Amino acid sequence: MDMEKLKRMQARGGVRTGDGKGTPRRKVKNVHKSTGMDDKKLQTSLKKLNVQPIQAIEEVNMFKSDGNVIHFAAPKVHAAVPSNTFAIYGNGEDKELTELVPGILNQLGPDSLASLRKLAESYQSMQKAEGGEDKKDDDEDDDDIPDLVEGENFEDKVE
């Protein structure tokens, strides 16, 4: 057999790769995602708890201890009130508290308000530190501006 033809066939994947004459061709392993099975198992366990869907929930925010927030936009929520169980479906995003501040203030509890105060204090201290650096920069910039000539008033010339 021609070597070039053999290389083309190997590149296509139509040639046996193995030890000897009677070995079968290599099978490609298919990896199946099991998200469907997990979802079915979750649905059956929620059905056992007799959950009811809750409509008209626009967003869900879960506050973590490190100050970040897990934000669900337009989630599906199911609840079983007797067993105090809630299931939230949707794509959750990790966000910082500062990203959600304007619309989230009415949802904050006492713990979250304390973390918001700490965040505001740290933000103010960062601004003061940056402001101190800017003041130094302003002093350096003043060297480039020439002083006014004595005896001349530029405001009179503008009017």
UniProtKB/Swiss-Prot annotation:
What Pfam family does this protein match (any one)? NAC
Q: Which GO terms describe its biological process?
A: protein transport
Compositionally biased tracts (Acidic residues): 136-153
**PROSITE patterns reported in the protein's UniProt record:** NAC_AB (PS51151)
Which stretches does the entry tag as region Disordered?
Answer: 1-39, 121-159
Q: What does this protein do?
A: Component of the nascent polypeptide-associated complex (NAC), a dynamic component of the ribosomal exit tunnel, protecting the emerging polypeptides from interaction with other cytoplasmic proteins to ensure appropriate nascent protein targeting. The NAC complex also promotes mitochondrial protein import by enhancing productive ribosome interactions with the outer mitochondrial membrane and blocks the inappropriate interaction of ribosomes translating non-secretory nascent polypeptides with translocation sites in the membrane of the endoplasmic reticulum.
Protein name (record)? Nascent polypeptide-associated complex subunit beta
Q: Which organism is it from?
A: Botryotinia fuckeliana (strain B05.10)
Print the organism lineage.
Answer: Eukaryota, Fungi, Dikarya, Ascomycota, Pezizomycotina
